[in-house]
Amino acid sequence: MLKEEDKIFINLHGQQSHDLKSSKKRGDWDNTKALLDKGRDFIIEEVKQSGLRGRGGAGFSTGMKWSFMPKNSEKPCYLVVNADESEPGTCKDRDILRFEPHKLIEGCLLASFAIGANNCYIYIRGEFYNEASNIQRALDEAYKDGLIGKNACGSGFDCNIYLHCGAGAYICGEETALLESLEGKKGMPRLKPPFPASFGLYGCPTTINNVESIAVVPTILRRGANWFASIGKPNNTGTKVFCISGHVNKPCNVEEVMGIPLKELIEKYAGGVQGGWNNLKAIIPGGSSVPLIPKSICETVDMDFDSLRTAGSGLGTGGIIVMNQSTDIVYAIARLSKFYMHESCGQCTPCREGTGWMWRVMMRLVKGNAKKSEIDQLLSVTKAIEGHTICALGDAAAWPIQGLIRHFRDEIEERICHLM
C-alpha cells in the first residue's frame, strides 16, 4: 500500500484548486532552477536509475528513451507529450490534465532540457475540451511567471510549450501517427526505422512520452532516484495511476504502488465487485488492448508489467475493466472488435481487412449461428494479424479475442450448441 507521504499526485481527485498558487503550495515549481543547473546528464541518469518505465502502455525505460536523443544535433529537437488518451477503460491522464496541470508543465520543462529541446508540444485528445482549457490556463500562468518561455526559471534555457488539440482519431495515440497529425497530415503510423529519436517531428530528433511519464519526473528529481526505486517491485518501480471501472461499487482513479495485488486494489479502493468477489467473471487489467484474465488468475496476480505478462495479459495503461457474472463476455469482446474495426486507419491490409472480418465472425458467435470450426479459424486470423502491421493497433485488435478464446472457449461453444 502506498504511504500518504509517497503520493505524487496529491490533487488527483481535484480536492484543491489547480491554479499556479495552489500548485506551488503542493510543491510544484519548487526551485526548479536548481534541478536545471545540475545539467542534462544528471537528469537523464537520475530518471534511468529511478527505473521509471513508460506509463502509456509499452513500459520502455523513460531515461533510456531520452538517452537516444543526439547530444549535439544540427537540427532542432522536440519533445511531444502524448495526451491523446482514447483507450477504452482509461482515464488516468485526463485527471492529471484536469487537476495537476502544473506537474505536467514542469515535467515538460525538465524533460525538454534533458533532451535539448527548446520546443515542446502537448498533443491532447480533441474531445478533452475542458482539460485543454485547464492546460492552456496553466501554460499562460507559467509564461506570466517566467517559469517557461525565454530564460525559463532564470536558467538561461529557452523552452516554449504549445498545446495542440487532436480531432478524435484513436490511431493518433500511436506515436508516429501523432507526429503525422501534428504536422497537419492524416494520422497514419510511419514505418520504423527511422525512429523518432533520429527522424521525428518535421524530420527532426523527437521524443514522445505519455502524460503520466512526464508528470512524475519533477518529483523523482526532487526526492531522488533511490526514493522512487524503493517503491514497488524490482523492474517495476514507483507509483502508478490505475483506473477502475465496470462492475465495481465505486469506480475510481487511484495512485498506488506498482505491483499491488489486483484483488486488493479493487476491494480497497473500488468498494469490491458488484455482488461480491465470488461474482467476478473476468477483468481486463490494462485497457481494452490487453487480453482479459479470468477470476482464477485475478485472485493472485499483481498489477505490474512483468506479473501480468506472465499471466498472459499486460499492464497496458492500467485501465482495469471489471466484469461480473452478469456480463455477456462474448458480446463484450465483440464490441471491442467493432471499436478497433472503426478506428483502423486502413494503411495495413491485415488490420484493414482483418478487423472487419473478426468483428463479423464475433457477431456470429454472439448470435450463436457460427460453426465451432470458426473459433479456431478466428484464432488463426488473430495470429496472422498480430505482429504483421506497421503499428500495434493490429495486435490490440487481436489480443482481446485471443484472451476470450483462451479462457472462455467453453462458453462460446455452449452458446453455439444451445442456439443451433
UniProtKB/Swiss-Prot annotation:
PROSITE patterns: COMPLEX1_51K_1, COMPLEX1_51K_2
Binding site for FMN: 166-213
Cofactor list: FMN; [4Fe-4S] cluster
Keyword presence, Cell membrane: no
Keyword DNA-binding on entry: no
UniProt keyword terms in alphabetical order: 4Fe-4S, Flavoprotein, FMN, Iron, Iron-sulfur, Metal-binding, NAD, Quinone, Translocase
GO MF entries: 4 iron, 4 sulfur cluster binding; FMN binding; metal ion binding; NAD binding; NADH dehydrogenase (ubiquinone) activity; quinone binding
Ligand binding (NAD(+)): G54, R55, G56, G57, A58, G59, F60, S61, T62, G63
Transmembrane residue ranges: none
EC number: 7.1.1.-
Disulfide bonds: none
Uppermost EC category: translocase
SUPFAM superfamilies, per the entry: Nqo1 FMN-binding domain-like, Nqo1 middle domain-like, Nqo1C-terminal domain-like
Cofactor info, note text: Binds 1 FMN. Binds 1 [4Fe-4S] cluster.
Top-level taxonomic group: Bacteria
Catalyzed reactions per annotation: a quinone + NADH + 5 H(+)(in) = a quinol + NAD(+) + 4 H(+)(out)
Binding site for [4Fe-4S] cluster: C345, C348, C351, C391
Entry-linked InterPro entries: ComplexI_51kDa_subunit, NADH-UbQ_OxRdtase_51kDa_CS, NADH-UbQ_OxRdtase_suF, Nuo51_FMN-bd, Nuo51_FMN-bd_sf, Nuop51_4Fe4S-bd, Nuop51_4Fe4S-bd_sf, SLBB_dom
Role of this protein: NDH-1 shuttles electrons from NADH, via FMN and iron-sulfur (Fe-S) centers, to quinones in the respiratory chain. Couples the redox reaction to proton translocation (for every two electrons transferred, four hydrogen ions are translocated across the cytoplasmic membrane), and thus conserves the redox energy in a proton gradient.
Protein family according to the UniProt entry: Belongs to the complex I 51 kDa subunit family.
Protein name: NADH-quinone oxidoreductase subunit F
